Each structure stands twice: as C-alpha cells, then as structure tokens.
Regions:
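Signature of the first transmembrane helix
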Residues: 7-73, 102-108, 132, 167, ...
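Hydrophobic alpha-helical transmembrane segments
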Residues: 20, 127, 131, 161-209, ...
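Membrane-interface helix-capping segments at transmembrane helix termini in multi-pass transporters
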Residues: 7, 38-46, 78-88, 99-137, ...
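Interhelical loop/hinge segments that connect adjacent transmembrane helices in multipass membrane
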Residues: 1-9, 185-189, 201-243, 247, ...
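Membrane-interface junctions at transmembrane-helix termini in multi-pass inner-membrane proteins
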Residues: 10, 137-162, 177, 186, ...
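Membrane-helix boundary and inter-helical linker elements of multi-pass secondary transporters
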Residues: 36, 152-153, 180-181, 251
Length: 286
C-alpha cells in the first residue's frame, strides 16, 4: 500500500514538473504571438476575461475542497458506499453551481462589452470571447467536476496533469496555426472551447472505464461536505488577493495596460507555481 502511494506520489511529481516546464515555454510564446498578430488590446481582453471568470468560481462555494477532504478517508479504506454518497452530494451542489455559472457567463457576455472598450474589437466579438471562455467551466461543473475530485483523492492527479498538458499543447499549437492563418481572437477562443470540451469528455470516459462501481443514485451524504462554508472564506480572500489587480486595470487603465501587466505577472506566477510544486503536499496526497 505504501509503495503504491509512493509510486503515485512520484508520478504526480514528475508529471507536475513536466507540465510546469511546458506551460512556461508555451506560456511565454503564445502571448507574444497574440501581441504581434492581434495587438495588445486582444491580449489584454483575454487576460481580463480570465480574471472575471475566476471570480465566478466562487459560485462553487467551497464544495470542491470540502468534498475532496471528505473523500480521502473512504478512498483510503476502500469504502465505496461512503464514496458514492459523498459523490452524490457533490453532484447535487455542482449541478446547481453549473446552472448558475452558465447564467453568470451569459450575463457577463452581455455586460462586459458595455463596460470595456477594445480598439479594433467589436462588442459582439467581446461577447463571444466571454461566452467561449466561460462555457467549458459551466460544462465542467455540470458533468466532470465531481469526477476530478475523486481522481485527486485517489492519488491520480497525474492523470489530470497529463491530460491537462496534452490539452494545453494542442490548444497552443492550434492557436499558433490559427494566428498564422490570420484568424482573430474569437476563433482562438472558439477553438479553446472545443478542445476543453473534448478534455471533459475524455475524463468522463476514463472514469466510466476505471470506476464502474460509481453509483449516481446513491443516497447523498450532505453532512460529509458541510465544512464548505468555512472553505469559501479562504477562497474569497485568496481570489481578491490574486485577481483584483487585473480587473482594476481593465476598467481604469484600459486593455493595453492590462496586456503589459499580465505579461510580467504571468512570469512571476509561473515561477511561484513551479517552486510551490516541490513543497506542496498534493504530490503525496494526490
């Protein structure tokens, strides 16, 4: 049992490190290509939209973290009945979260073009960028979110990391091709949306093949994830600390300033994440 856990932990470390190296390499290249091909306004728009969507993640209300913590015990002891009950409770909340997330994305798609001006980008294009950027998040909550939590609790973070790396590489190469062919920011985000929806489908397929014992009709154990209210307080403070700066720049300084700022912030964030991966207990817990 300990050797299996160590093997999973090592796999998480190796795949996590490789993912970070790929992310750093392509994360530097792609924004530069967007800047040279579409301009700083387009790059700033993408950064601003991502920050808005980060705030929508608060709709989860800490359910994800609370559910994963609740799953560690039953997964370790092999109590499938308890796992199914926790998963059923998580699904109930995630389904509601997905509905409100989708509604919020639609509202943002309608409002964001009215509050942000981008030179060379029409309001309808801004709306589509918001829609294509946010749709995968809604689908994630509706169909995949609870499945990812079980993989993490089961020490199989490397599965998600490998899939995330492949998805990121495909998305990045597709962006390079689309930019070379002269497509705009809307087409880039439409492609991003399509690739991420395929990723969600792959996770669902993986879970169907390897976790056939999951019972969607199990009696929900809401008490097991009752600590979500305590978790959300920490998530709010972290989100405000990490994401407020870009939104303030968006509304008061314009998208061109956002583009410059996020380039430096991105590099700092990559280095911070890379260092954090070595000290994080996630590699041991999965």
């Amino acid at each position: 049992m300990n050797s299996l856990k160590a093997k999973k932990g090592l796999g998480n470390i190796v795949t996590g490190l490789f993912n970070q190296l790929v992310t750093i390499a392509l994360g530097i290249l792609i924004p530069r290509l967007i800047l040279t091909s579409l301009g700083s306004e387009a790059n700033g728009l993408l950064s601003s939209v991502n920050q808005v969507l980060a705030y929508l993640a608060l709709l989860e209300a800490g359910i994800g973290t609370a559910s994963m913590q609740a799953l560690y015990g039953p997964v370790a002891t092999g109590d499938r009945n308890a796992v199914n009950r926790i998963m059923a409770a998580t699904h109930h909340f995630y389904r509601r979260t997905g509905f409100f997330y989708l509604l919020a994305v639609l509202v943002c798609a309608a409002v964001f073009p009215l509050t942000v001006r981008a030179e060379g980008i029409a309001p309808w294009q801004i709306a589509l960028v918001v829609l294509f950027s946010g749709l995968p998040g809604a689908v994630n909550y509706l169909f995949q979110g609870k499945l990812r939590l079980l993989l993490l609790a089961d020490g199989k973070k490397y599965v998600l990391t490998n899939l995330g790396t492949v998805t990121f590489v495909i998305t990045s190469l597709s962006k390079i091709l689309l930019l070379h062919l002269g497509f705009g920011v809307v087409e880039l985000q439409a492609m991003y949306c399509a690739v991420n929806l395929l990723q969600i489908g792959f996770v669902c397929l993986y879970m169907y093949r390897h976790y056939r014992w999951l019972d969607a009709k199990a009696q929900p154990d809401y008490a097991a994830i009752s600590q979500s209210r305590n978790v959300v307080i920490h998530e709010v403070s972290t989100l405000i600390f990490n994401n407020t700066d870009t939104l303030i720049l968006t509304w008061f300084c314009g998208l061109a300033s956002v583009s410059v700022y996020t380039m430096y912030a991105m590099l700092f964030g990559m280095v911070t994440t890379l260092i954090g991966n070595f000290s994080s207990a996630n590699f041991i817990l999965g």
